[in-house]
């Protein structure tokens, strides 16, 4: 029987952990002296009133490494698997959930063991776990050692494409497929690509790839950023988002907050009132419900 994993959880994370476990299909109960206990067929996760979190079960290793640490604890104390030195291509995006700014998609091709070993020696990890300064620094390292490509869809182009596709996942599939097609060797041989599974069905990306001139096989999985090549792509995509946001702010003399918070809505209203709907449309994603809420509030 494996030794249980024990850690202390900050009270600010109780709700997040509970919500994410429910999303993952865990059955929640509340035995005495606990805040909750969550069970799946292979994992039991118990959060005690003291804040002590205990994880056990045959699936606990994968649960900790691929969910608990990267998504909740934001640490990496669990042993890493052996470095994967298979040549491969990783692709990821940034800006998908941000009302203001572009959508940026990046691909990284690690063509040999030497390239992969150099990546493993760095502090490369999922860009969501890094600050802007770390991202900008690591991006230089990635560009110097890997083949890469970055697509930046400024809001004006993004809105045009969304009007064509009418679906964000189809737009993402087209963009990912375009990047993969540009970077994939021909013939692809044993090289494969890894992408985050952003749609409920893998067929969305596969159908987009069928329209391209590549025979490369693609692995789609949740939390693909756990792979170092996808993590490298996520860093280049985030770097592109950061620098493009700065360019937009300088071009329009505006301060554009990230995300989709109440502050974002407030800034959007200010831009609409002072600069008009046309300028607002040039710095934001107009299919977000936030856009209609801003416009409706101005006409009310």
UniProtKB/Swiss-Prot annotation:
InterPro entries: RNase_HII/HIII (IPR001352), RNase_HII/HIII_dom (IPR024567), RNase_HIII (IPR004641), RNase_HIII_N (IPR024568), RNaseH-like_sf (IPR012337), RNaseH_sf (IPR036397), TBP_dom_sf (IPR012295). The keyword Hydrolase applies. Its main location: cytoplasm. Keywords: Cytoplasm, Endonuclease, Hydrolase, Magnesium, Metal-binding, Nuclease. Its cofactor is Mn(2+); Mg(2+). Transmembrane segments: none annotated. This is Ribonuclease HIII. Endonuclease that specifically degrades the RNA of RNA-DNA hybrids.
């Amino acid at each position: 029987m494996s030794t249980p994993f024990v850690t202390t959880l900050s009270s600010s994370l109780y709700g997040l952990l509970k919500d994410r476990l429910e999303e993952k299909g865990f059955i929640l109960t509340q035995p005495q002296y606990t805040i909750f206990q969550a069970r799946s067929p292979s994992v039991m996760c118990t959060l005690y009133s003291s804040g002590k979190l205990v994880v056990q079960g045959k699936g606990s290793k994968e649960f900790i490494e691929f969910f608990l640490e990267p998504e909740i604890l934001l640490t990496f104390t669990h042993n890493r698997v052996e470095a994967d030195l298979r040549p491969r291509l990783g692709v990821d995006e940034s800006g998908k959930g941000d009302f203001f700014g572009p959508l940026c998609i990046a691909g990284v091709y690690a063509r040999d063991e030497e390239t992969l070993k150099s990546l493993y020696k760095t502090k490369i990890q999922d860009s969501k776990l890094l600050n802007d300064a770390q991202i900008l620094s690591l991006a230089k390292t990635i560009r110097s050692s890997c083949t890469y490509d970055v697509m930046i869809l400024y809001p004006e182009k993004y809105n045009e494409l969304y009007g064509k596709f009418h679906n964000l996942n189809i737009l993402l599939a087209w963009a990912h497929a375009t990047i993969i097609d540009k970077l994939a060797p021909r013939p692809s041989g044993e090289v494969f690509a890894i992408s985050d599974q952003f749609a409920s069905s893998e067929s969305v990306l596969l159908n987009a790839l069928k329209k391209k001139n590549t025979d490369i096989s693609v692995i789609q999985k949740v939390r693909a950023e756990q792979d170092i090549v996808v993590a490298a792509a996520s860093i280049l995509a985030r770097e592109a988002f950061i620098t493009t946001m700065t360019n937009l702010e300088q071009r329009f003399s505006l301060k554009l907050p990230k995300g989709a918070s109440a502050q974002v809505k407030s800034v959007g209203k200010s831009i609409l009132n002072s600069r008009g709907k046309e300028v607002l449309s040039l710095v934001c994603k107009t299919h977000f419900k936030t856009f209609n809420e801003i416009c409706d509030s101005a006409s009310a």
